[in-house]
Amino acid sequence: MAGLPVLYSFRRCPYAIRARLGLRAAGFQPGVSVELREVDLACRPAELLELSPKGTVPVLALPGGAVLEESLAILDWALQQHDPYQWRLAASAEPTTAALASALLAEADGPLKHHLDRCRYPERFGVRDP
């Protein structure tokens, strides 16, 4: 799969999920137009750490050597390549649409992520099942 972008991901990471969803929405298909490498976060591969010393996911390595380390940057890049639903055009033409998209992303990064973590990892936060 030489020449394809490579996405380093972890299936349960919400930011990696967002990157995978963004790539799929832009028409990228794992194994066809993007290589997906699931990472064991307990044993991060050396090539991931070479690309991104912080070792977090998602990371998208582009064929030209550029590296994207944030899910929103990956989403933006994917939609720059192919935007089948014209989301970028709609956002640029309609400020209200862009503001709504930003507000939804902020909600997903803030309160939703806070509660999602407590639901998925209750032992980390001392949460007991009612």
Regions found by a protein language model. Give the residues of each.
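GST-like domain detector, emphasizing the conserved glutathione-binding G-site
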Residues: M1-P130
